[in-house]
């Protein structure tokens, strides 16, 4: 590993910002050629938006609304599609994405205000549509828990996707929501290979811990599924059967998947990560990612961008659906209950 490797960070570089005419670089003064090797510390800024619920306009996602209590994500996943969104805030999609974070402390109040408005029509709202709502700073900020308290108070359906074990903290609220089919949880598992996980998703829970969480949630009646995403050919595609089997054995009710795409600055960030960590696989992995998307690692075409196309994509999908049929037959996630929503909020809560 190179001497300037920043431990615990997925990105190892700062990418330029497409919205900025200036690009800052480090100048080594006094003729020294020493590289900056100290890992940048995480900084949290408070953001105060006017609204918090975002309509989802992408037709291939299957969601109506999303809510993100945080912008940026300390998990630092090298492949994360959300990195590019950090440029809208004047930051880099690289190291800034995982070190310059924004928290929205007003989110619970704004959620309550929006779902109580006269024109709100109840529909499931997904937490973590962009960045993980249980990333490490949630332990300090607690915004996600307060959001769940609002969902529970008004019996409003909510979906969650995460790769962090902190969700275990909120089992009390999730169990309450599950009693009326008001919650669905998706645990994201990309690899059971701990070495790969540590390199690719440096500040996430281990795969074994995520499987434990699936089991704990399932045992208390909280519907949970596994999200095997993204599939990266040449890195984790061969793990599909094992991941689905392990998740099913611990009580997961369903499974989903997407294939990787490297839009915007992701190509630069991920290829740099791949060269540093798996140089012997670089050509194969990048070539196969391009094969999934018509010859380019980038893909913005709805439908194809998350599924891929061609022979390789068909092989991946066949392996996934064969495994899903084998391990998840006669299992389904419950449909969201849209009838329990109470604008009066006269539901008794006692979560401590």
Listing of model-derived features with the role each one plays in the protein:
Residues 1-66, 335, 352:
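Flexible, acidic/Gly-rich N-terminal and inter-domain linker regions that tether
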Residues 141, 175-189, 236-253, 314-318:
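Short, electropositive alpha-helical surface patch
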């Amino acid at each position: 590993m190179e001497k300037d490797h920043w431990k615990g960070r997925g990105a190892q570089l700062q990418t330029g910002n497409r919205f900025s005419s200036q690009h800052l670089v480090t100048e080594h003064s006094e003729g020294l050629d020493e590289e900056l090797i100290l890992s940048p510390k995480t900084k949290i800024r408070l953001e105060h938006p006017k609204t918090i619920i975002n309509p989802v306009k992408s037709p291939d996602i299957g969601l109506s609304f999303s809510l993100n209590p945080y912008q940026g994500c300390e998990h630092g996943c090298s492949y994360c599609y959300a990195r590019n969104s950090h440029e809208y805030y004047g930051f880099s999609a690289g190291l800034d994405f995982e070190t310059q974070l924004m928290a929205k402390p007003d989110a619970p109040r704004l959620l309550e205000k929006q779902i109580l408005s006269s024109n709100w029509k109840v529909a499931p709202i997904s937490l973590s549509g962009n960045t993980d709502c249980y990333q490490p700073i949630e332990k300090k900020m607690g915004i996600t828990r307060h959001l769940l308290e609002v969902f529970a108070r008004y019996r409003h359906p909510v979906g969650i996707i995460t790769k962090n074990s902190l969700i275990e903290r909120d089992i009390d609220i999730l169990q309450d929501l599950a009693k009326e089919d008001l919650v669905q949880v998706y645990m994201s598992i990309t690899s059971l290979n701990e070495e790969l996980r540590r390199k690719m998703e440096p500040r996430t829970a281990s795969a074994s811990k995520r499987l434990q969480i699936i089991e704990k949630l399932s045992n208390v009646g909280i519907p949970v599924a596994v999200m095997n995403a993204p599939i990266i050919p040449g890195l984790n595609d061969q793990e599909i059967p094992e991941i689905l089997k392990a998740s099913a054995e611990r009580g997961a009710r369903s499974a989903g998947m997407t294939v990787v795409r490297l839009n915007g600055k992701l190509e630069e960030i991920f290829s740099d990560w791949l060269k540093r960590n798996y140089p012997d696989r670089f050509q194969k992995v990048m070539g196969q990612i391009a094969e999934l998307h018509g010859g380019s690692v980038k893909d913005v075409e709805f439908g194809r961008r998350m599924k891929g196309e061609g022979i390789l994509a068909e092989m991946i999908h066949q392996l996934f659906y064969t495994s899903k049929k084998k391990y998840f037959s006669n299992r389904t996630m419950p449909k969201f209950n849209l009838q329990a929503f109470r604008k009066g909020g006269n539901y008794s809560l006692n979560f401590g």
